[in-house]
Amino acid sequence: MKVVSSLKSLKKRDKDCQIVQRRGKIFVINKKNKRFKAKQG
C-alpha cells in the first residue's frame, strides 16, 4: 500500500479506483486490481 500526501493522482491510475474514508483516514481502493491501494497520511 502506498502512503501519499495527495490521493488525486492515484485515483486516476485506474478507472475502478474509488476513494473511501475509514477510521478517519482516506484510502484509495480497487476491488478488481488490488495493487492500486493507497492511503493518505
Swiss-Prot record:
GO terms for molecular function: structural constituent of ribosome. The keyword Ribonucleoprotein applies. InterPro entries: Ribosomal_bL36, Ribosomal_bL36_sp, Ribosomal_L36_bact. Keywords: Ribonucleoprotein, Ribosomal protein. It holds the Pfam family Ribosomal_L36. It comes from the Bacteria. One of its GO terms (biological process) is translation. GO terms for cellular component: ribonucleoprotein complex; ribosome. Disulfide bonds: none annotated. PANTHER family: 50S RIBOSOMAL PROTEIN L36 2 (PTHR47781), LARGE RIBOSOMAL SUBUNIT PROTEIN BL36B (PTHR47781:SF1). Belongs to the bacterial ribosomal protein bL36 family. This is Large ribosomal subunit protein bL36. It comes from Rickettsia massiliae (strain Mtu5). The gene is rpmJ.
